[in-house]
Curated annotation (Swiss-Prot):
The gene is groES. It comes from the Bacteria. InterPro entries: Chaperonin_GroES, Chaperonin_GroES_sf, GroES-like_sf. Gene3D superfamilies: GroES chaperonin (2.30.33.40). It holds the Pfam family Cpn10. Its main location: cytoplasm. It comes from Thermosipho africanus (strain TCF52B). This is Co-chaperonin GroES. Keywords: Chaperone, Cytoplasm.
Length: 90
């Protein structure tokens, strides 16, 4: 299934980082904070937005923004470009 965001929205896939305590215990998903890093999977019409974002870019976004959806058992978020706080460059 292909999802194309409308307007100045992005489809992002949260980057899950494994969390361990100092003692080496892996925390379950329910004990983790919401991820704030994601990879852009699809972009809407960003002509009016003054941003340089493309598919494959990694970004930091506001913690409780966007709409969470599932596509083929994978978690994604549809988010407004204004809720993107920063672009991560490696």
């Amino acid at each position: 299934m292909k999802v194309i965001p409308l307007g100045s929205r992005l489809l992002i896939k949260p980057i899950q980082e494994e969390k361990r305590t100092e003692g080496g215990i892996v925390l379950p998903d329910t004990a983790k904070e919401k991820p704030m890093k994601a990879e852009i999977v699809a972009v809407g019409n960003l002509e009016d937005a003054d941003v340089d974002l493309h598919v494959g870019d990694k970004v930091i976004f506001s913690k409780y923004s966007g709409t969470e959806i599932k596509i083929e058992e994978e978690d994604y978020i549809i988010i407004d470009v204004e809720d993107i706080l920063a672009k991560i460059e490696d």
